[in-house]
């Protein structure tokens, strides 16, 4: 269905992919359970953390991971001379990001708490601290850097091709970094060809990937219970 011509055209003008991704109806959850039960017979495990090590050691050849964990896995595999790649299903995927926000219930009208929360968010959003966090956790920040090119330069430092690299590909990050309209090509990396399907594609997916991705919404308590029961049935029976 997701790859049908009708659905692909509808994606250009509607939120149909978002609706599909966030469908928690009883009927859909039952269908998902049936698929997962069949998949489980050919699956090494249903667990994310151990999957990273299993990819590096060669126990498994395919692993569904969050993009940052994918970057971590590829980095670790490189140390052993193993080159792994990252891909997003052509049917679509979950579009997500890490960020900080102030909870109304946490602030509760307290001016000092609000000031402290704002100070922390301002501090953690500084480009230099954004880079420190990205280096440590392997996940892309929602911060592009504003007037500062520091974060883009960090991406270039991580993934840009060396001067003597023979086969390179342009990797356009203009959609993410500010100022792209005024300075075309300013935010285009020259990366080694294999890198275009590795870490940089996990950190900064191309626009073609974003167009077939949607944000997962917070499920209701009823939906969470329904999905939790489904997972129990899949894993335990």
Predicted regions and their residues:
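Solvent-exposed loop/turn segments at secondary-structure junctions
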Residues: 67-71, 91-94, 107-108, 128
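Soluble non-cytosolic domains of exported or imported proteins
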Residues: 26-30, 49, 111-115, 217-225
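Sec-exported extracytoplasmic/periplasmic mature domains
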Residues: 37-41, 56, 60, 75, ...
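Ligand-binding pocket segment of bilobal, Venus flytrap-like solute-binding proteins
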Residues: 2-87
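Mature extracytoplasmic/periplasmic domains
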Residues: 103-203
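Conserved C-terminal helix/tail region of periplasmic/extracytoplasmic solute-binding proteins
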Residues: 178-237
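Solvent-exposed, polar/charged alpha-helical surfaces in well-ordered, non-transmembrane soluble domains
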Residues: 34, 53, 57, 115-122, ...
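Periplasmic solute-binding protein
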Residues: 1-5, 95-103
């Amino acid at each position: 269905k997701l790859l049908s011509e009708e659905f692909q055209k509808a994606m250009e003008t509607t939120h149909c992919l978002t609706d599909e991704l966030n469908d928690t109806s009883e009927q859909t959850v039952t269908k998902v359970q049936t698929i997962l039960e069949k998949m489980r017979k050919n699956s090494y495990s249903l667990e994310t953390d151990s999957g990273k090590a299993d990819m590096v050691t060669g126990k498994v050849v395919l692993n569904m991971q969050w993009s940052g964990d994918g970057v971590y896995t590829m980095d670790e595999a490189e140390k052993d001379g193993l080159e792994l790649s990252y891909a997003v299903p052509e049917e679509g995927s979950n579009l997500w990001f890490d960020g900080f926000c102030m909870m109304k219930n946490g602030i509760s009208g307290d001016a000092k708490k609000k000031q402290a929360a704002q100070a922390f968010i301002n501090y953690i959003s500084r480009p230099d601290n954004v880079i420190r966090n990205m280096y440590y956790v392997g996940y892309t920040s929602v911060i592009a850097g504003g007037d500062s090119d520091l974060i883009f330069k960090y991406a270039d430092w991580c993934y840009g091709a060396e001067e003597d690299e023979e086969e390179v590909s342009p990797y356009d990050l203009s959609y993410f970094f500010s100022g792209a309209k005024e300075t075309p090509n300013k935010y285009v990396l020259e990366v080694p060809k294999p890198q275009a399907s590795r870490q940089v594609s996990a950190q900064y997916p191309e626009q073609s990937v974003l167009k077939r991705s949607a944000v997962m919404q917070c499920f209701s308590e009823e939906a969470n219970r329904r999905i939790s029961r489904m997972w129990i049935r899949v894993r335990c029976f």
